[in-house]
């Protein structure tokens, strides 16, 4: 058992990813915690995972079920890789089955024998030397009581019995609404020492799961709602954004962008641990920049990883081949890994966990994401910004160079790089733009931002052929390129304006 003491309160690590950070060390030892949520908010998974993590730490557990029979729970939890039947055989997990049995007549007020239930719980805890217990769900045993005072009295009696046993308990309770009354009867939260709310909110036709520690008697905890997700073979994974600290080291080492001309524009290349955002309209060359970024890394003996959310693997390989880059050979040599997923396959939290896992497993020196816009369209702005913060902070902690692409909504110009304003999070910004001149469509590139370094301020013309990107000379005597309204300015006017600035200086 791993205990921790905070503010005089001993704590038990739950082992649920992210929760022990939010709770400043885990659940208060020997106390009861209420997990409240609407149907489908993951209360039962939380209660089960609490016992699973305990077993993996050598702590036996008791699961008291009031709704689902043990057989159904065993089957439902098998998808997470939890073999409850085996743990039962080993005496590590025991059910106290208080669920309705076929043929049972409905309970009427005053008939439920709480004393008998408490006796069964006490017997199971003592026999199996359990230190953790989960009760799911309280509403099932108190639904026959119409008097809230009686509900409170019975709850207090149950909580007192658990406290006497010295076990750390999880009790789940049903909520009617995501925001409003904490519990169905309005008294459960007053009996429990701690209250945690899990939500599954529908916003903009998308589901978003969050967890909030509402009450933690006698000890500190993180405030507010935090996103979480449910993953096969893992269970609940909480993403505590407040755990992100700006303590990572900053490197002065430069890495190549894959283009000599762009390296010169950036003052000898990117910093090794920087996050670069490449923004431009469709077809301006963003994926080409990703390809050259990967090619430059592999040429220097670096391991490179690409997450593609718009194109299939075959398309990426074909496009790279067309620019003279052999992705297949790089993969054979183990220097490159290409991961292609459609954004719609899952939510952003799942994508983030998946990307973190792959980064930790492959251990790349460079990571590219093409494109953020594909992920932005399947999420809310809040979820998207949290995703970006979570991903960029993780990449920086690993001291990895990252290149993200973003598609601007306008073909010419653009008022904002993204609706989520992620430009403040990135270290460098490169803009790619179409430039319409004399009935011809050209391309322009500029380094808008390069944190900690001098860089070229010009907007330069570039072309694309079978050898990739070629950056040329600056656009001269042309204004309004970034706004999407390029206008030719006579040389005499340029000289006059330059003279005005010289006079002021």
UniProtKB/Swiss-Prot annotation:
The modification Phosphothreonine is found at residue 424. ATPase activity is influenced by KaiB1 and KaiB3 in vitro; ATPase is reduced 35% by the KaiB1 tetramer and 55% by the KaiB3 monomer but not affected by KaiA or the KaiB3 tetramer. Gene3D superfamilies: P-loop containing nucleotide triphosphate hydrolases (3.40.50.300). Disulfide bonds: none annotated. It catalyses: L-seryl-[protein] + ATP = O-phospho-L-seryl-[protein] + ADP + H(+); L-threonyl-[protein] + ATP = O-phospho-L-threonyl-[protein] + ADP + H(+); ATP + H2O = ADP + phosphate + H(+). ATPase activity is not temperature compensated, unlike the circadian oscillator, its activity increases with increasing temperature. Its EC number is 2.7.11.1, 3.6.4.-. In the homohexamer the 2 domains (called CI and CII) self-associate to each form a 'donut' layer; the compactness and local conformation of the domains varies over the cell cycle and impacts function. CII has the autokinase and autophosphatase activities, both CI and CII have (weak) ATPase activity. This is Circadian clock protein KaiC3. It comes from Synechocystis sp. (strain ATCC 27184 / PCC 6803 / Kazusa).
């Amino acid at each position: 058992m791993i205990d921790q003491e905070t503010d005089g309160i001993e704590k038990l690590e739950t082992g649920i990813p992210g929760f022990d950070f939010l709770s400043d060390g885990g659940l208060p030892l020997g106390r009861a915690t209420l997990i409240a949520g609407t149907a489908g908010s993951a209360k039962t998974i939380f209660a089960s995972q609490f016992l699973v993590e305990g077993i993996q730490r050598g702590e036996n557990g008791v699961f008291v079920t009031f709704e689902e029979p043990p057989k159904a729970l065993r089957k439902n939890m098998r998808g997470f890789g939890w073999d409850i039947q085996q743990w039962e055989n080993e005496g590590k997990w025991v059910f106290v089955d208080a669920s309705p049995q076929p043929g049972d007549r409905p309970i009427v007020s005053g008939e439920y024998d709480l004393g008998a239930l408490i006796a069964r719980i006490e017997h199971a805890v003592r026999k199996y030397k359990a230190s953790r217990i989960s009760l799911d769900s309280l509403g099932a045993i108190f639904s026959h009581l119409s008097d809230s005072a009686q509900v409170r009295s019975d709850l207090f009696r149950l909580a007192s019995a658990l406290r006497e046993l010295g076990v750390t308990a999880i009790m789940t309770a049903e909520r009617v609404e995501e925001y409003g009354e904490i519990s169905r009867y309005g008294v459960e939260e007053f009996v429990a020492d701690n209250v945690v709310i899990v939500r599954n909110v529908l916003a903009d036709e998308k589901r978003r799961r969050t967890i909030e520690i509402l009450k933690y008697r006698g000890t500190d905890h993180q405030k507010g709602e935090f996103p979480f997700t449910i993953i096969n073979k893992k269970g609940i994974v909480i993403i505590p954004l407040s755990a992100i600290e700006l303590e990572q080291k900053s490197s002065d080492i430069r890495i190549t962008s894959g283009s000599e001309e762009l390296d010169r524009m950036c003052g000898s290349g990117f910093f090794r641990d920087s996050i670069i955002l490449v923004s431009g309209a469709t077809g301006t060359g963003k994926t080409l920049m990703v390809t050259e970024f990967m090619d430059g890394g592999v040429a220097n003996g670096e391991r490179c990883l690409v997450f593609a959310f718009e194109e299939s693997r075959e398309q990426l390989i074909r496009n790279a081949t067309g620019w003279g880059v052999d992705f297949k050979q790089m993969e054979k040599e183990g220097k490159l890994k290409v991961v292609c997923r459609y954004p719609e396959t899952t939510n952003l939290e799942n994508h983030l966990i998946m990307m973190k896992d792959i980064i930790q497993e492959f251990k790349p020196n460079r990571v590219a994401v093409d494109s953020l816009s594909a992920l932005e369209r399947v999420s809310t702005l809040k979820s998207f910004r949290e995703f970006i913060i979570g991903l960029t902070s993780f990449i920086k902690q690993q001291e990895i160079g990252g290149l993200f692409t973003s598609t601007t909504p306008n073909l010419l110009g653009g008022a904002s790089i993204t609706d989520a304003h992620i430009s403040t999070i990135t270290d460098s910004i490169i803009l790619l733009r179409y430039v319409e001149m004399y009935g011809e469509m050209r391309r322009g590139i500029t380094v808008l931002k390069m944190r900690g370094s001098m860089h070229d301020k010009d907007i330069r013309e570039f072309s694309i052929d079978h050898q990739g990107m070629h950056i040329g000379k600056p656009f001269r005597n042309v204004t309004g390129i970034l706004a999407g309204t390029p206008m030719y300015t006579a040389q005499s006017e340029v000289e006059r304006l330059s003279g005005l600035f010289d006079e002021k200086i």
